[in-house]
A protein has these predicted regions:
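A short, structured surface patch at a secondary-structure boundary
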Residues: 75-138, 177-180, 184
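A hydrophobic, helix-centered structural microdomain
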Residues: 1-65, 176-205
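Short, glycine-rich, amphipathic interfacial segments at transmembrane boundaries or analogous
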Residues: 43-81, 141-159
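Alpha-helical membrane-protein architecture signal
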Residues: 2, 6-9, 57, 78-82, ...
Length: 205
């Protein structure tokens, strides 16, 4: 399978050629998050990965502390729980940066179906026949569904995930990574309505 060598080549190359930028991001982002409310820099979720394996994910916090106690699990448009800096992180998807650690560990790939919180995955498996089929591939930071999906309907996401699983190849991954990079540069990752909030299955440090 090409996935593991593909991920390691890209990850290693990025850290070599973009080291100054990555060092800046890893320094500035935590400082801004902490200085805004002296709260935690990361939040942690347990998600469901390939073949149902559970793993721990860290992301930069984009919502106020204890967001799960202040509103619904699902993020709404113009959600007041999202901080001002959190909006920037979400638009650029830089809140996902800590998940590169999961790529190093082999739990996540650059491209693949989005890993869902355990409870969300279990609930959707109960209501949508065949939803567990998306677990046949390693989850990804970005993917076919994340790039092309214009709706939050789980059945549509499943259709896109299965389409990727059945056709995945290095050239498709490169294409999806390129589109994702453009979205990050232009700040187009801002459609989070109806998706799981930062507080879903949150585990406090």
């Amino acid at each position: 399978m090409y996935k593991r060598p593909f991920d390691l080549i890209i990850l290693t190359s990025a850290h070599i050629f973009l080291f100054p930028l990555l060092l800046l991001l890893w320094t500035v982002i935590p400082l801004i998050i902490w200085s805004s409310d002296r709260g935690s820099i990361f939040y942690i979720q347990i998600r469901t990965g390939e073949k149902g394996k559970k793993f721990k994910v860290r992301k930069f916090r984009t919502m106020v502390e204890n967001a799960d106690q202040l509103g619904p699990v699902w993020t709404k448009a113009k959600d007041p729980r999202i901080t001002r800096f959190g909006k920037i992180l979400r638009k650029t998807a830089l809140d996902e940066l800590p998940q590169t650690l999961n790529i190093w560990k082999g739990e996540v790939s650059f491209v693949g179906p989005r890993a869902l919180p355990v409870k969300e995955q279990e609930e959707l498996e109960k209501s949508i026949p065949g939803f567990n089929k998306r677990l046949q591939a390693k989850p990804g930071l970005t993917g076919y569904s994340q790039v092309y999906n214009t709706t939050d309907e789980p059945t549509v996401k499943l259709e896109h995930d299965l389409k990727y699983i059945n056709t995945m190849n290095p050239f498709l991954d490169i294409k999806l990574l390129f589109i994702s990079l453009i979205n990050t540069i232009l700040g187009k990752w801002d459609s989070r309505e109806g998706k799981s909030s930062d507080s879903y299955s949150n585990i406090k440090n």
